């Protein structure tokens, strides 16, 4: 009886952890994407709270993202200028307080793709519940598993287009 109860308990814990920490089924979903961007371009549509990685032939991979709060959104073009695993983070208002990479309290999550211009990045998160919202200071937040997928697909120099 104990063995059955323990198995049932473990199953419930596993399912609860999976539901809370997982991206929805649409994460990295291949979709039609009719726009004039070259394969390999990242397009962020802040109004949709979606990031598209253009794969070519009218197709893209679509990811849910968190974007800038009201007054913190931006639009324009950039390039990926750095790729970091377990990046450290410092608050823009207090750069002396650094949260080390890999810390559960680090809002950058497991990886970051920094953007030219020096202010913004596409990165993971320690708050998966924030994905799909207007939540950041201008950065593009992704589920950790999604940013790792994108991280493996792109290189320094990848073009990024952010639209409203």
Regions found by a protein language model. Name each.
Residues 30-32, 138-144:
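Short, structured beta-strand/loop micro-motifs enriched in basic residues and often containing a Trp
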Residues 73-75, 137, 155-157:
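Short edge beta-strand segments in beta-sheet-rich domains
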Residues 89, 146-164:
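N-terminal targeting pre-sequences for secretion and organelle import
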Residues 129-138:
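Short, basic/aromatic beta-hairpin or loop at an interaction surface
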Residues 5-7, 17, 48:
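Extracytoplasmic entry segments of secretory-pathway proteins
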Residues 27-125, 149-152:
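Gly/Pro-biased beta-strand-loop elements
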Residues 15-24:
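C-terminal segment of classical bacterial N-terminal signal peptides
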Residues 1-12:
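Bacterial N-terminal signal peptides that target proteins for export
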């Amino acid at each position: 009886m104990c063995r059955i109860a323990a198995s049932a308990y473990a199953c419930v814990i596993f399912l609860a952890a999976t539901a809370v920490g997982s991206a929805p089924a649409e994460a990295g979903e291949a979709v039609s994407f009719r726009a004039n961007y070259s394969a390999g371009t990242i397009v962020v549509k802040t109004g949709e709270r979606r990031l598209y990685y253009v794969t070519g032939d009218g197709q893209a991979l679509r990811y849910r993202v968190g974007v800038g709060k009201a007054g913190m959104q931006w639009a324009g073009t950039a390039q990926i200028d750095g790729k970091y695993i377990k990046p450290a983070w410092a608050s823009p208002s207090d750069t002396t307080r650094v949260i080390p990479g890999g810390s559960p309290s680090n809002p950058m999550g497991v990886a970051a793709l920094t953007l030219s211009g020096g202010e913004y990045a596409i990165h993971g998160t320690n708050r998966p519940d924030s994905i799909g919202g207007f939540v950041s200071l201008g950065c593009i937040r992704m589920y950790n598993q999604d940013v790792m997928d994108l991280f493996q697909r792109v290189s320094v120099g990848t073009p990024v287009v952010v639209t409203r």
